[in-house]
Amino acid sequence: MSDSAPEIETPVEEAPKAASPAKSPAKSPGRAKKAKKDGSDKPKKPKAIPTHPPVSEMVVNALKTLNEKGGSSVIAIKKFLVATYKVEIEKLLPFIKKFLKGAVLKGEVLQVKGTGASGSFKMPPPAKKVDRPESAPKKKATKTKTRVERKEKKVVAKKPKPAVEKKAAKPAAKKAAAKPAAKKAAAKPAAKKPAAKASPKKAAAKPKAKPTPKKSTPAKPKAAARKPAKKSK
């Protein structure tokens, strides 16, 4: 009897799990839209450079060139622009009407007939030229005149100060009047001086009377002679 060898269980190796794919970060909807737009955007066409001048300049040129006495209608202006500038007139028509309305209000264009953007239009007559250099010196002259008048007014306003001088002049006049009085007073003593001169004449006359005392001296002996007569009694 043969013994059977014990079976050895070999561990079964598990197959390695397949690596899970890395999760890609979720794209935001905004970025996704931008990416789509970037991919779908086509190169922009450059803006067409206008081959004609501004509407205002074209309309003014049309009115000056046509120069109709009764004014030019919008239809005539359109024809002129098409013939001269070769423009798509239907696209420019709203701008033409807008310019005409504004120019009429500002006085840049005269509306002969109609109202608004309908009717006929023409350019206003040229304004008369005024010689500005001639008018400018006149203004300067007026300014100088006003300055001179102001200075004269200031001088007139300052004239009340001499009134004080007049008041001071009055005492001077009184002094002048007092001086003649003093002269008169001085003249009076001058009149007295002749009297003083006359007094020496009187004094000179007095010595003539001096011989009289000499006559009186001889009379004294007569009295002395009389005294002895009394003793005889």
From Swiss-Prot:
The record places domain H15 at 51-125
List localization entries. Nucleus; Chromosome
Ranges of Basic and acidic residues composition bias in the record: 128-137, 146-155
Question: Per the record's keyword annotation, is Nucleus included, yes or no?
Answer: yes
Region annotation (Disordered) ranges: 1-55, 115-233
Q: For this protein, what is any one GO molecular function term?
A: DNA binding
Q: Where is the composition biased (Low complexity)?
A: 17-29
Please give the positions of the paired cysteines in each disulfide bond: none
Q: Which GO terms describe its cellular component?
A: nucleosome; nucleus
Any Pfam family matching the protein? Linker_histone
Return the InterPro entries for the record.
H1/H5, Histone_H1/H5_H15, WH-like_DNA-bd_sf, WH_DNA-bd_sf
| Xref: Gene3D superfamilies | Winged helix-like DNA-binding domain superfamily/Winged helix DNA-binding domain
Q: What SMART domains does the record point to?
A: H15
Ranges of compositional bias, category Basic residues: 172-213, 223-233
Q: What does this protein do?
A: Histones H1 are necessary for the condensation of nucleosome chains into higher-order structures.
Spell out the family assignment given in the record's similarity comment. Answer: Belongs to the histone H1/H5 family.
> What is the name attached to this protein's record?
Histone H1-I
